[in-house]
Amino acid sequence: MSLQPAPASRVFMELVPWADRGRENHPISAAEAQPIGRRPHVAEAHPGAREVHVSGAAEVSASPDRALVTVRVSSTKEVSAEAKKSVCRRLDYITQSLQQQGFQAENVTVTKNIRRVENAYHMEAEVCITFTEFGKMQNICNFLVEKLDSSVVISPPEFYHTPGSVENLRRQACLVAVENAWRKAQEVCDLVGQTLGKPLLIKEEETKDWEGQTDDHQLSRLPGTLTVQQKIKSATIHAASKVFITFEVKGKEKKKKHL
């Protein structure tokens, strides 16, 4: 599976501290006039601000949610009608077995092809089955192998992800990284007796995604020898994100004494 490159780091949010309100009639500085990507961090632009700067990282993964299995049925006869009859008989058995298992028509695709081979006719049919439950997939494949003869060939399953899975995983990694950074900042403020305020800057500094494990390169050279679990592991996608956040820091509010 070819994954698209992740976008570059970008600033998600930058809020001006409350102390800067009321400056509408004052000229802005050269640093403030720069684009967001070139402006210094809030702590540098506002040296008097009370802030905490933290980073957060996260890595998430998702197993494939689809599997494609192809069942091929073929027959070669001197008469075309006999070749068709032989293939269609087994084809009907396969489709009926799938219907009994509750498969919807949109998850099953059937194609047929007949051609001349010297002085005979060769009929071939393919049944492409999309599975969402891998346990049911194994049971059905084992059942068809037991019930049908050697002229029926069942391909190994091909595991894949539905469209949009990689982008959804990238977003999830970023959100978890932000949550981890927020928890870190919260613990720091609790430790020093302060109150964590609103975020002033949220920036994703690094994001990446990949398929399979980094140590699976040897297994990928022999795809025909992989077990089902190894194939699922090899098709699993991963995403990592690293964020930088600046939070406002507030002092602990003192409780008023009631007379």
Swiss-Prot record:
Q: According to its UniProt record, in which tissues is this protein expressed?
A: Expressed in testis, brain, kidney, liver and heart.
**Stated name of the protein:** Interleukin-1 receptor-associated kinase 1-binding protein 1
Phosphoprotein found in the keyword field: yes
In what way is this protein post-translationally modified? Phosphorylation at Ser-55, Ser-61 and/or Ser-63 is required for full activity. Phosphorylated on at least one of Ser-234, Thr-236, Ser-241 and Thr-246 upon TNF-alpha activation, which favors nuclear translocation.
UniProt-listed GO biological process terms: immune response; positive regulation of canonical NF-kappaB signal transduction
The Gene Ontology terms for molecular function here are: signaling adaptor activity
- UniProt free text on domains: The disordered region interacts with HSPA1 and HSPA8.
